[in-house]
């Protein structure tokens, strides 16, 4: 038994990757590659940016790390199903919204909530930051949270309010939420790298990160890249950012939640002209896309518009002082009519 434990410990050390000595391991850790999984999912060009590693050596190091971490290559469908069993779900606070999402917000997936101002995007983020800390039998994952705040919308007072409604100590809940304000798109991307270092530290302390939130995803990208001439550069940068988030989710079995802004399509004459910003890059990378709309008073309507395995559908929920809650039956019936 002890030999197996030693072997597992060896596997997670960077120095055990063929071609990686103590000095290279030190440089990798300083660059944010603190585990063999992080090395295994890196690209050769990314690793070549670490001092002293050529692109040729980077390819060899990545291949060796993939073998040790058992990442890459083909696997049978039943093995994929077995791996899918490690996926967890976080309750939103509303049974109907959870049902729409197939049981809650999934780990190892990007869930995008988009809608107009006041549609409930940030409220859902705050609620998830509380709920992820609940025990598993109550819909949580007993995990920590990282929030990348691009619009200065995080409010600790709201967290305390929602936590106390769940019977939790608000100040204790806040201790497990790590917030960083992103000042531009480069800083936003850098914070994902910093999040990996923080996640490693918290993992060792027995407080694993189970949720990373970006509220909002496109705010800085839209402000900095104006006009059609900059669109290609913006989309390339955005693509890398989303893939970095996805890697984080897979490495730490964390849910990735992003909020997104909307724009009106002038070419749509009938129906709802609203669409999320970010183009095809966001559309293809987000696993679940939920369109949020304002209803009467505290009611909000969530429409699932894209998912790999769930049908399109709608759910009605309420945003109250206590947080995200189910709508009353009479409100649901009115919507169906």
UniProtKB/Swiss-Prot annotation:
- Keywords associated with the record: ATP-binding, DNA damage, DNA recombination, DNA-binding, Nucleotide-binding
The Swiss-Prot or TrEMBL record annotates one GO molecular function as: damaged DNA binding
Task: Kindly list the positions annotated as binding ATP.
Answer: 115-122
Q: Any stretches that span the bilayer, and where are they? A: none
> Mind listing the GO biological process terms from this record?
DNA recombination; DNA repair
At the top level of its lineage, which domain of life is listed? Archaea
CDD domains this protein is in? archRadA
Family, per entry: Belongs to the eukaryotic RecA-like protein family.
Its biological purpose: Involved in DNA repair and in homologous recombination. Binds and assemble on single-stranded DNA to form a nucleoprotein filament. Hydrolyzes ATP in a ssDNA-dependent manner and promotes DNA strand exchange between homologous DNA molecules.
Query: Which PANTHER family does its entry note?
Result: MEIOTIC RECOMBINATION PROTEIN DMC1_LIM15 HOMOLOG (PTHR22942:SF30), RECA/RAD51/RADA DNA STRAND-PAIRING FAMILY MEMBER (PTHR22942)
Protein name stated in the entry: DNA repair and recombination protein RadA
- Origin organism is Archaeoglobus fulgidus (strain ATCC 49558 / DSM 4304 / JCM 9628 / NBRC 100126 / VC-16)
Gene that codes for this?
Answer: radA
